[in-house]
Amino acid sequence: MHRLLRGGHLQSFHEYIERWQKQHGKRLDHDERVRKRQARESHKQSQDAQNLRGLRAKLYQQKRHAEKIQMRKRIKAQEEKNVKSSAPDEPSKTPLPQYLLDRSQATNAKALSSAIKDKRAEKAAKFAVPLPKVKGISEEEMFKVVNTGKKTHKKSWKRMITKPTFVGSDFTRRPVKYERFIRPMGLRYKKANVTHPELGVTVQLPILGVKKNPQNPLYTQLGVLTKGTIIEVNVSELGLVTTSGKVVWGKYAQITNTPENDGTVNAVLLV
């Protein structure tokens, strides 16, 4: 819907605020008020999430869930856009000398990405691991039954993991109604104290993923960190290079302590 203004211009009905601001200007404290309103938004969202009940709470959580998924997708798309491609957009028509040929093509990102994929494709079993045998963990010890159901609480299909876990940055929770395995935030670890056996140094490195949990394939899928688990860590800080001169980014390590007792993850690098 549009309306005709005095000058003969068409204007949408929802643009009257912009028209008023063009004619009369803004309040002197307009920018400050906008800044404060935006700063209060997160507090308002938190208050609604904690205090809404019933159908309103359900609809609000669905809305927030969809917003978070879209935000994660936007962030991921932005990060992928920032990575340089290995091939140039158009081949240059002007001839270049030999020593300048490699400057026009950004191959580092592609090489690192390929190296990481190759590393992940390898089997962890090919390494001589420091802990060849570990004690088994029963499902009763690993999972705590969470009773659900309106009023009666008779349903017992949900499980809470009682051991430390690793959850990737791209993980998006399912709606609460369909979430079978709950991984508490207090038991999630992102870094490990990794010891290099040859260099004799211990460094705190970010965990990239769980390669294999010796207890159960399900525990591997859930990212459970127990003694003897093979994890992949980011070793770019150590400055390791391959024989061809490429930077080593991801490397496997085995957890040597009991994280749920110690409150930290200690591991030995597999070299």
Swiss-Prot record:
**What keywords were assigned to this record?**
Nucleus, Ribonucleoprotein, Ribosome biogenesis, rRNA processing
Quote the biased-composition stretches of kind Basic residues, using this chain's numbering: 61-75
Ranges for the region named Disordered are: 22-97
Q: Where in the cell is it found?
A: Nucleus, Nucleolus
Motif Nuclear localization signal 1 covers: 25-32
One biological process term in Gene Ontology: maturation of LSU-rRNA from tricistronic rRNA transcript (SSU-rRNA, 5.8S rRNA, LSU-rRNA)
GO cellular component labels: nucleolus; preribosome, large subunit precursor
Q: Where is this motif: Nuclear localization signal 2?
A: 62-69
What InterPro entries does the annotation carry? NSA2_fam (IPR039411), Ribosomal_Se8/biogenesis_NSA2 (IPR022309)
Where in the sequence does UniProt note compositional bias of the Basic and acidic residues kind? Answer: 22-46
Q: Which PANTHER family match?
A: RIBOSOME BIOGENESIS PROTEIN NSA2 HOMOLOG (PTHR12642)
Function, as annotated = Involved in the biogenesis of the 60S ribosomal subunit. May play a part in the quality control of pre-60S particles.
Family from the record: Belongs to the eukaryotic ribosomal protein eS8 family. Ribosome biogenesis protein NSA2 subfamily.
Q: How does it assemble?
A: Component of the pre-66S ribosomal particle. Interacts with nop7 and rrp1. Interacts with rsa4 (via WD repeats).
Name-wise, this protein is Ribosome biogenesis protein nsa2
The gene name on file is nsa2
